[in-house]
Curated annotation (Swiss-Prot):
Family: Belongs to the bacterial ribosomal protein bL19 family.
Identification of the protein by name: Large ribosomal subunit protein bL19
Protein source organism: Thermosynechococcus vestitus (strain NIES-2133 / IAM M-273 / BP-1)
A molecular function GO annotation: structural constituent of ribosome
Gene: rplS
Function, in words: This protein is located at the 30S-50S ribosomal subunit interface and may play a role in the structure and function of the aminoacyl-tRNA binding site.
Taxonomic superkingdom: Bacteria
Length: 120
């Protein structure tokens, strides 16, 4: 057993199996665990998936939303223990793998058309 096999076996133990199918363009709600003092709570973060990286345990999504007129992007490690839940709210119809052009658009120009042929 070489080093690569050992790394893969450790990563396989820590990977989550209950993740939904997520595509670029989807509107998602991510529940993030926040620790404040000795209490822990779940903070929802809702936005559009503008980028994805699919590399095993390092799988990430970049979620963008506009809050008080300012665009905010967060990158979430999907297999992180700090991620409590991920729920797909709406499927989006896009023709690109990365939606970085949405950074330059504001208001109605940054909307993504809904897609109805994929189940939630």
């Amino acid at each position: 057993m070489n080093a690569q096999d050992i790394i893969r076996s450790i990563e396989a133990e820590q990977m989550k199996t209950d993740l939904p199918v997520i595509y670029v363009g989807d509107r998602v709600r991510v529940g993030v665990k926040i620790k404040e003092g000795d209490k822990e709570r779940v903070q929802p973060y809702e936005g559009d998936v503008i980028a994805m990286r699919n590399t095993g345990i390092n799988r990430t999504i970049t979620v963008r939303r506009v809050f008080q007129g300012v665009g905010v992007e967060r990158v979430f490690l999907l297999h992180s223990p700090r991620i409590d839940s991920i729920k797909v709210i709406q499927r989006g119809k896009v023709r690109r793998a990365k939606l970085y052009y949405l950074r330059d658009r504001m208001g109605k120009a940054s909307r993504i058309k809904p897609r109805f042929d994929r189940p939630l």
